[in-house]
């Protein structure tokens, strides 16, 4: 599987959905023709390299299945400082929580612990070298009528 580790901010299991940003700067002396990276998250991610959106996912799954996406990062790289970043939303819960429609969209079954996993090149592998920031002003509001649709999202930009 590579040397990337599942990473998340903090140590505890959250009881509310969370939106967390991850970022790492990497210095590249040259750009390879191809650089395959594998990525997954609990529950959803958007991968950015040098400010360009590279991928979003993972493919939705339920139960014990966890999909990992593979992307070619080479077209997004340049020599010098390269910034790799990911936005990750974690919908908390387990099968019982999902059955009550209080874990997020019913097509995305989550676990109690959020996470990001990236691997394929040691410079990019997720580890303690990533900075992370939980977005405190981002809230998930429960749906009032049709809970199976998931949450409404609210951003406080102040």
Where are the language model's segments positioned?
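Accessory beta-strand-rich segments of carbohydrate-active enzymes
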Residues: 11-13, 17, 22-157
